[in-house]
Amino acid sequence: MAKNYYDITLALAGICQSARLVQQLAHQGHCDADALHVSLNSIIDMNPSSTLAVFGGSEANLRVGLETLLGVLNASSRQGLNAELTRYTLSLMVLKRKLSSAKGALDTLGNRINGLQRQLEHFDLQSETLMSAMAAIYVDVISPLGPRIQVTGSPAVLQSPQVQAKVRATLLAGIRAAVLWHQVGGGRLQLMFSRNRLTTQAKQILAHLTPEL
């Protein structure tokens, strides 16, 4: 069966978007607010009608992720910020694999996310209450699977409990995208053997987005 590289690229961009947001948060203490909203909202939608629907139904919602994906696919340097993004992206894929093989872990994750949906009736998605709840899911369900993702950035920034919660919530969104990536036919070998195909697809999607003014 032929791979749907459009869906695979969108899901991969979802992982990369989380990686980029984690990097921004760790270094600056803040990140692209619109992209963060899209990524966090993807956690909540358990029954999307399509891959694009997971990310709000608009390719533009994944602009940050698509641009990051191109950087990761074509990274000539294994040092600095690009190396961080590659490490976060690959680490999320490893954790997703461990999540799938850990008995009962996916069910636990689903039940905890259902709890988030109930909280959303009373609190905003980016409220401290929801951020803390999403961070707690990451700590309780994902972190024990190991190995833990080492987030690097400004030590002063990373000491903030609010930033820590946002980083963990964003990593949870990355796991969500990695689950989706696997569901639509994604696999790590594609990063080696289908790099050109993924690059072309990401460029095509970006090409028909309206430019940011």
From Swiss-Prot:
<keyword id="KW-0175">Coiled coil</keyword>
<comment type="function">
    <text>Negative regulator of phage lambda lysogenization. Contributes to the degradation of the phage regulatory protein CII. Acts probably by holding CII on the membrane surface, away from the target promoters, but close to the FtsH protease.</text>
</comment>
<keyword id="KW-1003">Cell membrane</keyword>
<dbReference type="Pfam" id="PF04356">
    <property type="entry name" value="DUF489"/>
</dbReference>
<dbReference type="InterPro" id="IPR035932">
    <property type="entry name" value="HflD-like_sf"/>
</dbReference>
<protein>
    <recommendedName>
        <fullName>High frequency lysogenization protein HflD</fullName>
    </recommendedName>
</protein>
<comment type="similarity">
    <text>Belongs to the HflD family.</text>
</comment>
<dbReference type="InterPro" id="IPR007451">
    <property type="entry name" value="HflD"/>
</dbReference>
<dbReference type="GO" id="GO:0005737">
    <property type="term" value="C:cytoplasm"/>
</dbReference>
<keyword id="KW-0963">Cytoplasm</keyword>
<feature type="coiled-coil region">
    <location>
        <begin position="99"/>
        <end position="126"/>
    </location>
</feature>
<keyword id="KW-0997">Cell inner membrane</keyword>
<dbReference type="GO" id="GO:0005886">
    <property type="term" value="C:plasma membrane"/>
</dbReference>
<keyword id="KW-0472">Membrane</keyword>
<comment type="subunit">
    <text>Interacts with CII protein from phage lambda.</text>
</comment>
